Amino acid sequence: MLGAIHLGVLAACFVLFVPMAMAGWHLSRNKMLFFSGALFISLAVCVHLTPYFPSVSDIVASVSSVVVYDHRISCINEVNQIVWDVKPVPNPESVRRNNGSTKLDYFVKNWDWMKSRKVLSCEFQKLDKFDVSDLLNGSWVVVAGDSQARFVALSLLNLVLGSDSKAMDSVRGDLFRRHSDYSIVVKEIGMKLDFVWAPYEKDLDDLVVSYKKMKKYPDVVIMGTGLWHMLHVNNASDFGFRLRQLSSHVESLVPLTPKEQEGGGSVSGRSVHLFWIGMPVLINGMLNTDEKKEKMSDTVWHEYDRSLGESKILRQMGGPLILLDIQSFTWNCGPQCTLDGMHYDSAVYDAAVHVMLNALLIESHQSL
């Protein structure tokens, strides 16, 4: 293509300047005729060169697509930028009269996205039940991991079904059966949600490989581990190694382009949206066993956090999964948002779900 352009330009120069020079020699006394001839030849050259150059509409489309792509990346990077407003309830006496109340009930927890120019340009929003129903209509959602993942699944179902609905009463009981999987189909919108108890990275790895073998892929996968490994293995280097293994399998979870299968046929390219549930801030003095206080110290926590970053499993580090920044949320919500220094108020996981949904809107090029 480049050689054709060079050849065309060379020919154009010959066609343009040789006749102009000849015309100038013979018509130097008639400047009007000279310039008319020059203009005619120039227009003819432009007509002949036009096929070798992209159209203006192509250039504009190319530039606009780059701008949209850059804006999308910028908004994904900003989606976790939320701030918290945690205040004591105005009437603590009413909380005291409630027999089932805990320390968490004495504080009102509100959150929203930061009001910086970058964040405002992304137009993030808290979605209601109807918005989420439209977004996840007909989707297969998988939430896999430890207890943090279970709380994320609960918050998502709260939003889809309505926290006050009768369906949520049974969901809470079934979802929190100790160390078990859970599955539900929301018939009204055709959404299926699977919670997979997978407290170790190897469990997540096996899950991802199973989807690859079956050639059946969820639309959304939300996963996260770390706490069990920290408590029961207590080796940050091994944690990082396991995450790198997981990352390599997640990257090949689905074909990016149609590929031929063995025995004929093709696998159509499709998009699986992948999210990682970050580890919460651990408040050591509030942990409920001596073993946890010893093995899950601040030093160990930071080693695990560093291994997570170095594993390159996260999108911000060049990996496949978008971070749901539970670390930031729990740090900013503070000790008023936890009873045991590890598991936090539902508001934290609600925020994570809204962050995930806004990222999903960006990734799937949708708007509400």
UniProtKB/Swiss-Prot annotation:
Glycosylation sites: N99, N137, N235
Record-level GO cellular component terms: Golgi apparatus; Golgi lumen; Golgi membrane
Residue intervals on the Cytoplasmic side: 1-32
Intrachain S-S bonds: none
Compartment(s): Golgi apparatus membrane
One GO term (biological process): xylan biosynthetic process
Glycoprotein is among the record's keywords: yes
Alphabetic keyword roster: Glycoprotein, Golgi apparatus, Membrane, Transmembrane, Transmembrane helix
Function comment: Component of the plant cell wall polysaccharide acetylation pathway. Does not directly catalyze O-acetylation of xyloglucan but exhibits weak acetylesterase activity in vitro.
Protein name: Protein ALTERED XYLOGLUCAN 9
Gene: AXY9
